[in-house]
Amino acid sequence: MSSSDSDSVSLSIRRRQRRGSSKRISMKESDEESDSSENHPLSESLNKKSKSESDEDDIPIRKRRASSKKNMSNSSSKKRAKVMGNGGLKNGKKTAVVKEEEDFNEIAKPSPKHKRVSKANGSKNGAKSAVKKEESDTDDSVPLRAVSTVSLTPYKSELPSGASTTQNRSPNDEEDEDEDYKWWTSENIDDTQKWTTLEHNGVIFAPPYEPLPKNVKLIYDGNPVNLPPEAEEVAGFYAAMLETDHAKNPVFQDNFFRDFLKVCDECNFNHNIKEFSKCDFTQMFHHFEQKREEKKSMPKEQKKAIKQKKDEEEEKYKWCILDGRKEKVGNFRIEPPGLFRGRGSHPKTGSLKRRVYPEQITINIGEGVPVPEPLPGHQWAEVKHDNTVTWLATWHENINNNVKYVFLAAGSSLKGQSDLKKYEKSRKLKDYIDDIRKGYRKDLKSELTVERQRGTAMYLIDVFALRAGNEKGEDEADTVGCCSLRYEHVTLKPPRTVVFDFLGKDSIRYYNEVEVDPQVFKNLKIFKRPPKKEGDLIFDRLSTNSLNKYLTSLMDGLSAKVFRTYNASYTMAEELKKMPKNLTLADKILFYNRANRTVAILCNHQRSVTKNHDVQMERFAERIKALQYQRMRLRKMMLNLEPKLAKSKPELLAKEEGITDSWIVKHHETLYELEKEKIKKKFDRENEKLAAEDPKSVLPESELEVRLKAADELKKALDAELKSKKVDPGRSSMEQLEKRLNKLNERINVMRTQMIDKDENKTTALGTSKINYIDPRLTYSFSKREDVPIEKLFSKTIRDKFNWAADTPPDWKW
């Protein structure tokens, strides 16, 4: 129950007239999703029933003939013309975003380890099936047609007719260039040179290690151990995580202990630490817990001062000067050392992430400008002046030897250009998609196994938005995509049902039971034939690289990821077209989230149910009850004012579900406590201000006791209401009460909609598809077209990232 509810009750009892305009209903911004049926954009068009096929369809592909191979090779090697989609931004009048007053703040198996294949284009045992030609089931598929070529600068074509460019700015405009630089209105978006001049201040390194107090030690076999600082730091990483699930994972423990001993040896530390089970990290753990509690209980002023000092130290690293403009830098902090967690069942979880030094880092900066200073006594690995890349610094991390970069922030011009090009590329696919689908459907019946596998993989990537997948090493997480599907990941159920069950990206389980095209089902059955067994690749003639190389021959820049972006944006566009008319704001947001959730399901963007989800649902239910209680009181006020309404409006006598006398007693106690809390907080705020001006003017405690009597009066009045079953309307007129009742009905509907949205979204994550796959112009145009504040659909982070899409007009078409 919020304090606003307490206000509502106390004001009516004290007979204070409610005045002013009605508050607008507010929905809490949510990046969560809601329920929707599965809707793959192609499932209807591609999974049509075909003619029944005889048993001879299961005959293996016969040995290919030379002439057939030649003909098909010629057909598949035809060049496709390049085209750029009619992208860009159209001008449209900006619709004002009405800020709304908050009426109510929202309370807010893995599959078993599989055998791996050492090579992507061969089965585990090395056996290769002969390439065979299948019985004739030809299809008059038309080869991919060439599409006319247009200019490579699509953004200019959709510029507003009166849009200004950097060439015709006034002096006043130039003063605001850093803040309002709209790169998307520029005529020149160069794919090669990314910048002309670049200045920055480098990166921030992790602070040096501070040794533990002398009385805090690692205990080994009952005895304290005096570790050298380097080893003590690593032991502390584990001790700080002692009560987490990670620290209880045997793989995590083994990897940590191995690297801990390695650091001990590197320090030439003479020790007898041999067994992890004899290590006791309790002292260290309690020390870190104490430090956490001290930080939590730190006075607000002290926290503010520490934050201010940190911000001042970091300020110069947050910005760079790009082509004379001040632009924000993204991840300018070098990740501190620690223990690698990894996602899912990662085999390297618990391994030591070592401290990064300047000698590992390459700096990229403009020529003729000061090079950032490294740490004292150190030097950069290399200083480059490469204006064809967008990173400011790079290095290799030690866990997986991955390359790490420092880029500009998500809302920067370079990042924005990259995003716009990505979404334009997916729009461009619209001009090719029909021919590409005809092509891969023809390949589904190809005489060549490699083409048949490629066509089947393209079908799965297109229809079910599967990732392409890459071959994994033994020391990498066992995650799978389309090209790396293994025998055990695909189960076939005649006549044409396929069950996919594997760990996808980030070790998130992908489970989907779907009906597929009969030819696809038949192909998968062929690809699983003996001698293939568990651990063997389904697509043993196909790799991600070869697939993407082939896709590039169909359309410049086309890859499996472009298909995901295309299908995500296409699905969202189609779902938004189903928008019913005359919806409330809350229902519009729910509709949008359900459309978004359809995309998230398509892309397998899942999440686990939060631990406090049930608690949140209970809070929602209680808040709805509190609003129903207010509605019941308003109805009683109306009946008290005009008793005859009991006959003409019998709905005023209707009981509110769940509002019993026992619940009301408990609720009255809650209102009483909230009123006291509100009075105390107001008293404390006043005293803080008075103390700052003149310590002698601070209000005495006796004043607080006087003020708290108002809460006691409220309690007495509420108890009297409960006994009499009547509520005094005070000075309120019938018209005012009716307005308040209508407002309250709307608030209850909003709260119920929020509750539905929250519950439907508990296992699906909206954020990933919003940030990476759905064209943001779809959301901006929807926002303007349906008068939904963009703040209800996009968080500030996403709005900053896609600032280039903010001018999208309401009639923009994907």
Swiss-Prot record:
Which one of the record's GO molecular function terms can you name? DNA binding
Q: Which residues carry this modification: Phosphothreonine?
A: 138
Q: Which InterPro entries match?
A: DNA_brk_join_enz, DNA_topo_DNA_db_N_dom1, DNA_topo_DNA_db_N_dom2, TopoI, TopoI_C_dom, TopoI_cat_a-hlx-sub_euk, TopoI_cat_a/b-sub_euk, TopoI_cat_euk
Residues modified to Phosphoserine: 52, 54, 136
- Do the record's keywords include Ribonucleoprotein? no
Question: Which residue stretches does the UniProt record annotate as biased composition, category Basic residues?
Answer: 13-22
- Active site residues of this protein: 773 (o-(3'-phospho-dna)-tyrosine intermediate)
Biological process (GO) annotations?
A: chromatin remodeling; chromosome segregation; DNA replication; DNA topological change; mitotic chromosome condensation
Instruction: Say if the entry is tagged with keyword RNA-binding.
Output: no
Q: Output the superkingdom of the source species.
A: Eukaryota
Write the record's keywords in alphabetical order, separated by commas. Answer: DNA-binding, Isomerase, Phosphoprotein, Topoisomerase
Name of the top EC class for this enzyme: isomerase
The UniProt entry, under CDD domains, shows: Topo_IB_C, Topoisomer_IB_N_htopoI_like
Q: What else is known?
A: Eukaryotic topoisomerase I and II can relax both negative and positive supercoils, whereas prokaryotic enzymes relax only negative supercoils.
Q: What is the role of this chain?
A: Releases the supercoiling and torsional tension of DNA introduced during the DNA replication and transcription by transiently cleaving and rejoining one strand of the DNA duplex. Introduces a single-strand break via transesterification at a target site in duplex DNA. The scissile phosphodiester is attacked by the catalytic tyrosine of the enzyme, resulting in the formation of a DNA-(3'-phosphotyrosyl)-enzyme intermediate and the expulsion of a 5'-OH DNA strand. TThe free DNA strand then rotates around the intact phosphodiester bond on the opposing strand, thus removing DNA supercoils.
Summarize the subunit comment: Monomer.
The name of this protein is DNA topoisomerase 1
